[in-house]
Every structure is written in C-alpha cells, then in structure tokens.
Amino acid sequence: MSYVIAFYIHHHGSGHFMRSLAIATALKHDKMVFLGSDLNRYKDIVPENIQVLDLPMDTPLSTDNKFTEGSQVDCFHYAPLQVKGVTERAAMITNLFLENSPMLLIVDVSVEVAMLARLAAVPTVVIRQHGKRNDLPHKLAYQSAELLIAPFDKELETSEDVEVLRKTFYSGGFSRYSKNQIQINPFNDQIAILIGKGGSSITLEVIIYIAQQCPDQYFHVLGEIKIAQKEHPLNITFHGQTNNVEEILSRCALVIGNLGHNTVMEVATINRSFIGIPENRPFDEQLDKAQAIAHINGFEMVLPENIFKTDWKRLVQNLLVIVPSMDSLITPHAIGDIATEVKRLAERLF
C-alpha cells in the first residue's frame, strides 16, 4: 500500500531539521512531507520531492489579546488558551493527516504534536534526546508512539524507564559529515569555536578571554555572533555563517562549543578533542549529554559559570597531547539503519 512519511521538525536551532533531512534522504521514499515553523529558511536545501508545510508559530502575538496560560495541564508541556497560531497549527496538521492517509509521522520533537497525531489515529515515531525526560508529558508521548529512536549508542543511555528502553531503537551517532571525507591532518595551533543557532553563552567576551589566555593558538569562530567595533586579539578569525565549516574544522586539532546533539556528533565524526560548554536547556539536555560522554578520551566539560575561572591554556595543552576517541560515538551505517527500521514499521502498519 502507498503511504506518506511526514517529519514534524521543531524550530529551535537547526539540529532537528538537519537530522530529519539526513533520515529523509536515506529513506528515498516517494511521498514525504516536512512540517514545522520557520522551515522557509531551509528552502534552498530541501529536496524537490519533499513537500513542505510551513506552520505558524505557537507563541502569542500582539493580536492575541485574550491569551492566557489557562489552568495547569499536567499532560502537556505547552497548552495556552486563545492563541490563534496554536489553533491554526492544529487545524493545518490534522488537515494534513486527513488528506495524506495513511501516514507515518516522525516527530523531532514535540510532545503535543505526538499526542495530536495519536488522537487523530496517525502512528508516530518519536525521536529521543538526552535530558531528564521522566515527566508525565514525555511518558505519554513515548507511550503513544509505535517506535522510539535514539540517535546515539545504547552505552550513552541515561534513562532508567524500562518501557522506554524496551521501545527504543539505538542507531548510534551520525552527522552531516562523512568520516571518509576527512583527510586533512589537524594543526595543533588551530582551534575552532562553534556558535550554534540555539543560543550560546560563548559570547565575544568569552572568545576574547580564551584567545588572550592562549596566545600561541589561532581561533576560528564559526557561526553568528555579535562583533563589537572594539579591537580583538589578532589570533581570532570570525568566519560567520560559512559553507566550508567541515574544511575549517578538519584543520583544527581542538573544538570548543556547546553540547547540542548535532555539534557533538559533527566533532565526533572528524574525531577532534572537544571542550563542551553545556547550555541551560529544558530538561538539562546538554548537561545530561555531557555526563553521558564524560568517559570519552579527548572530551572535557566546562560549565558556563566556570568559563572565567578556567585555566584555558592548561586545559588546551592537556587536551592536545591526548589521542581523542570522540569517533567512538559514530556508527557509519546509523542513518541507513534508521531508514530500515522506519520502513519495517511502515510495512507492518500499512
């Protein structure tokens, strides 16, 4: 039977989109849909065979003058009242379900969308993330799903929920890069600083502080950051948003960045030593991931509150003499295995 595979993509950062794109590419399915807010920013890289449903944001606008949080609802993370965007989203999503049946929905990520799909009789695959997700909304979303996918190895599991563990397929790690493409030997005096799109405590002040402590190192800053007009050390280059991130990273022996999933996996793919700064995220996601990979050679964590208390010169020097094993987080066939699991589920369902 013909069926549609749809991906709900959370708008925060770019990691959810990049993961969905990788899985969709591996699926090679003829009928696929991406749905989420602010997807138009990716219009130049979405394949032509994938339909895009750009949803309104679910936050109140100035015109939502009757907006209220309403009574507390334990089964959802976010369920405001009288927000037009929320009403429109629900209508657009359920209309998509109605017009594209049968459908399998891959949710990356939203408890509310997963539950809406189940209420509409649409089977789901829910992508798991690190973090303390033993709350009721997560438990209900996981129960409602036909399959849970963890884009990391089972050895990195931090949950103790037996039902969640039993339902989870562990793909191992992957990124948009390929191990086979990395042929450049790194230079010990080159360090990359990654600034993600989800918000970071790695500010210009922090970058200057680190560079001043490490005058023998040259720093490549990748990502959007507000650069003041004041002078900064000469051992810093601000590349901004660039298309040759992989090439720059591969020249660097060490990477400094936050602990978003995709950042960790990209560093792991090129197998560079990594100083991870866990940002304050819901459910302690990045801190949980840092603790999960703490045993990996070449990884060190610096808490945001300790940035200006850290001896960066010593930390960098210590890491540069270690042979990293960050690549142990990567499973070369991970994306293909996810595609196989999704297809197997769809064949059983439809």
Residue ranges and their predicted role:
Residues 9-21, 200-202:
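A short, glycine/small-residue-rich beta-strand->loop->alpha-helix junction that serves as a flexible
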Residues 10-11, 30-84:
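Conserved nucleotide-sugar phosphate-binding/catalytic loop shared by glycosyltransferases and other
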Residues 16-27, 40-41:
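Short amphipathic alpha-helix
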Residues 24, 186-254, 305-306:
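Donor-nucleotide binding loops and adjacent catalytic segments primarily
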Residues 71-113:
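Conserved nucleotide-sugar donor-binding subdomain of glycosyltransferases
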Residues 107-108, 245-288:
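A donor-sugar binding/catalytic signature common to diverse glycosyltransferases
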Residues 144-200, 224:
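A nucleotide-sugar donor-handling region in carbohydrate enzymes
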